[in-house]
Design a protein with these regions (language model features):
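Rossmann-like AdoMet
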Residues: 1-52, 69-103
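Conserved class I S-adenosyl-L-methionine
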Residues: 51-60
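Acidic active-site catalytic centers that drive phospho-/nucleotidyl reactions
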Residues: 56, 85, 108
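Short, glycine/acidic-enriched loop or turn micro-motifs at the edges of active sites
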Residues: 59, 88, 111
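Conserved small/polar residues in nucleotide/adenosyl-binding loops
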Residues: 105-111
């Protein structure tokens, strides 16, 4: 398993750095800013589908999924979301990234390993 180091980005949100690949999961200029702009503002909000279907290959940190959940609740829109990840993160790492707000800790999210 590859080492992953949590780093703060310029907007204050966290991302992961993989030294073996010399690669970050998100832009170091802002993980949340990048995901919000690309995935939500230019993707989800631009869709006219009543119930959008999203397939994310390379689920990564789950930030795109998290922002999608927030937008779905804000817009009262149903979204069918599937995320695939070959190397899923440990729950402890997800918690340390700090994306999940206290108001959502009641959620039980389904997972299935294939």
């Amino acid at each position: 398993m590859m080492e992953r180091i949590i780093e703060k980005t310029d907007d204050g949100s966290a991302t992961l750095f993989v030294p073996e690949l010399n690669e970050h999961y998100h832009s170091t200029k802002g993980a949340r800013t990048e995901s919000q702009h690309i995935f939500i503002d230019m993707g989800l909000k631009a869709s006219s589908a009543t119930t959008p279907r999203i397939l994310e290959i390379g689920f990564g940190t789950g930030l795109n999924a998290w922002l999608t959940l927030e937008e779905a609740e804000r817009s009262r829109r149903n979204i069918l979301y599937t995320g695939l990840e070959l190397y899923p993160l440990e729950w402890q790492t997800i918690e340390q990234l700090g994306y999940i707000s206290v108001s959502y800790t009641h959620l039980t999210l389904p997972t299935k390993r294939i």
